[in-house]
Amino acid sequence: IFNKRKNLFALNIAKKSKQGRMILTEGYMDAISLHQYGFDCAVASLGTSLTEEHAAILAKYVPEVVLTYDGDEAGQNATRRAIPMLEKVGLRVKVLRMQGAKDPDEFLKKYGADRFSLLLDKSENQAEYQLESLKRKYDLTDDEQRVEFLQKAAQLISTFPSAVQREIYGARAAEAAGITAEAMKV
């Protein structure tokens, strides 16, 4: 019996790629478009959210996954849900942000493969993605919102597994809010 929870669209092609990573898309049309533009490492879950089974399958083939889900709220929620699932199976997770297009298919049609490749190379690690997503919710010129951002950022950063990550991203949050890194440690 065919089980969507255990299959990834285009895995048969992507697993042969020499890229050393897979690009995970929200829909199969995005994966098809990426393949047409030369990105042979793209896969998509088949009409279902990413599952633990999908994550385990990806981990068999590559050390890194780049999430390229849609930029809408549903896509960003799916990105946030996927990150811990992928990390749990030992994958490095990066997130690609697209400006000016809702998904990879639209981006490629508007801007082309070269520009997508540049974005791919600049994709954020999960810590950068989560901190930047949090920052975008606040007006950091307003003191009350700066305080709220810093409180939420501190909660987020405290979940990062290494002291080095906490130091780096604590300093970035402090810089974004215009305070010293020392004040962030208090």
Residue map of PLM features:
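A charged alpha-helical hairpin associated with nucleic-acid processing machineries
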Residues: K15-M22, T51-V65, Y69-V186
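Phosphate-handling DNA/RNA-contact segment within nucleic-acid enzymes
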Residues: I1-Y61, V65, A78-T79
